[in-house]
Amino acid sequence: TSSTTKMFVIGHNHFNKSLTLDIENRLMLYLSSVGNVVRVQNRKENPQNEYYTSNELDSIFSKIWRSLRKRNQSLFPIESIVRNSAIFKASPFHKLTEEQIEAKNTIINKIIASISKGQEGTLILVKGEAGAGKTVLMSSLVDDLLNSEDISFIKDNNYINLVVNHNNQLSVYKEIERKLNWNSGSTLEVAMKPTQFLNALKKNAIKAGVVIVDEGHLLLTAKNQSYLGGNH
């Protein structure tokens, strides 16, 4: 610890275990979206279901955030600024809906089944309308594949990569990768552009493991001059 280190102790007379864990989760969600935050250290998520005081979460959290903002405005910006940031909207710390949880578990189970059977080239396609929550689902999936102890054997035996074609969205994921200290398991970065990823695999003689592709339908089908191989 440094002599300049500060600790904020947060308490409330309505706190119970579930509400406390939800407050912690939301703090990770908000702080990982703040530009001045370099690294989020405690990353164990504990999303809670409905409980006695769950309806007070929003109001209590806002009160806590405003109180923290009085102490450090650069670390705790106005809530609306945080919530409108691109990183916030793509953060893996969002509480998933039941549909998103079911989809994520289905994907993970299919990955496990494919690995167990020694299958290669397995394609898992996720479809959804714009605004259906695919971005948060994908972000949460990547974070689980990289960090969840329950499925750690997947990363132990496979490199994990996220392929993103859109420059702005790639910048968002690169920022998340930096703040959450994502590690693909290889010399490659986790989030990469398609041509960069394919060229890096070839250059480093690395075999792809589990690859999550964002907006896969937008990938080029024509030959790209920056790609050293054939069409993709």
Walk through the language-model features, giving the residues of each.
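AAA+/P-loop NTPase substrate/partner-engagement loops
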Residues: 144, 148-182, 194-200, 204
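Boundary/linker segments flanking structured domains
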Residues: 3-114
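Hydrophobic positions on the alpha1 helix immediately C-terminal to the Walker A/P-loop
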Residues: 137, 141
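Conserved RecA-like ASCE ATPase "motif II neighborhood" in helicase/translocase motors
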Residues: 180-232
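Switch/connector loops and helix/strand junctions flanking conserved nucleotide-binding motifs
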Residues: 15-21, 170-172, 219-221
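Conserved helicase motor core of SF1/SF2 NTP-dependent helicases
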Residues: 97, 104, 108-115, 127-132, ...
